[in-house]
Amino acid sequence: MNISIISIGKLKEKYLKQGIAEYLKRLSAYAKVEVIELPDEKAPENLSEAEMLIVKEKEGIRILDKISDDTHVIALAIEGKQKSSEEFAVSLDRLATYGKSKVAFVIGGSLGLSSEVMKRSNESLSFSKMTLPHQLMRLVLLEQVYRSFRINRGEPYHK
């Protein structure tokens, strides 16, 4: 399976970079995983609704440029479906079973994802009803993908 994590914004925190590097190393035994960092759109603090839409659309174009037609796209969004680790593992296993060898997880910028990215997505996933920093979500997502492979192979992993 080829997994892409497409994320808006540059990761700056060293501890997050280290955690991500560790999970990428662990995942290399199970799948080809790449993290694609795309620049965020510079925007002032107090944006109007129209300006927010423009920012999301510009970021959305960058995201969609990185997704091929045969890729199964999972958008990370607060309004997405919440799953347990076991349910997430089953859904990843099903994708592999049904020949979906390319999977892209999409993490938007601070304003979220554009409507075009959401339309292109095959499903939407939420890790919490809470708002979490998109940089942190990369690490949490990689950990859950790793956990899914361990679950699907019946390998031990701490709970």
From Swiss-Prot:
Catalytic activity: pseudouridine(1915) in 23S rRNA + S-adenosyl-L-methionine = N(3)-methylpseudouridine(1915) in 23S rRNA + S-adenosyl-L-homocysteine + H(+)
Compartment(s) of residence: Cytoplasm
Primary location class: cytoplasm
Binding site for S-adenosyl-L-methionine: 76, 108, 127-132
GO CC, one annotated term: cytoplasm
Keyword terms of this UniProt record: Cytoplasm, Methyltransferase, rRNA processing, S-adenosyl-L-methionine, Transferase
Molecular functions per Gene Ontology: rRNA (pseudouridine-N3-)-methyltransferase activity
Listed EC numbers: 2.1.1.177
Described function: Specifically methylates the pseudouridine at position 1915 (m3Psi1915) in 23S rRNA.
HAMAP family documented for this protein: 23SrRNA_methyltr_H (MF_00658)
Record text on subunit structure and interactions: Homodimer.
Protein name: Ribosomal RNA large subunit methyltransferase H
Encoding gene (name): rlmH
